[in-house]
């Protein structure tokens, strides 16, 4: 088995990638700003990064921030990986980074190009939005009495555990270049997703679609962020877990945790 470094290994995706790789018998190092012994800020680089990649066969690069710094972080990581003789760099990107003119997407696309031109063996996987991100957007919109959502926009949310499994498999294999995109099992309109969220959460809100302006909105409305098939595009992969299944499992987990907490408090009181 190989030694694999996972950047952003304590995050939503990186944590699951780490668990999957360890379950498959790989030696895994977790790099994040606060995880010892490889606590490294990739935007700064430095000797800590060199120690983290020393003796590593493969790097799975999950660390990312919409607040900026991804390109600088990737340059530092690639430089250290080349110096250490890393064999394979796996990068997780987003479906639509070349179709939707959003600042964060432009940064992800720039990192893709850095990876491709790194001189390392490389693999790039693009995935659609995680269920968790769509949920956060809907929860934010539901803070108002009326849920205001961009008109005419659909989404294709995917289960993060399925993305993690795909990344782990790619990390264990030979460099493959740009691989087929991974999207969720269903393309759904935002109002449809919102109504599913309201139904499972037991909340009541009026859902209203609002036309917006700008290139990013036009890109999302045109479906540039969805997995494309046919018309000369490579066939994309699809996850299996639907948004309703994600919401239901999350609600059931919260219910079990609540019951366990109440039982614990009752036991202590008795």
Where are these regions (language model features)?
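A hydrophobic C-terminal alpha-helical subdomain
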Residues: 198-256, 265-270
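Non-catalytic, hydrophobic alpha-helical segments
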Residues: 160-167, 182, 190-193, 246
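Rossmann-fold NAD(P)-dependent oxidoreductase module
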Residues: 16-20, 80, 114, 166, ...
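NAD(P)H-binding glycine-rich loop region in Rossmannoid oxidoreductase-like domains
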Residues: 26-84, 94-100
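Glycine-/Pro-rich loop/turn segments that contact NAD(P) or position catalytic residues
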Residues: 65-143, 155
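Glycine-rich "substrate-gating" loop/helix at the edge of Rossmann-like oxidoreductase active sites
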Residues: 128, 149-160, 183-186
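N-terminal Rossmann NAD(P)H-binding glycine-rich loop of SDR-like oxidoreductase domains
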Residues: 2-26
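Glycine/proline-rich active-site loop of Rossmann-fold NAD(P)-dependent oxidoreductases
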Residues: 132-138, 170-180, 203-205
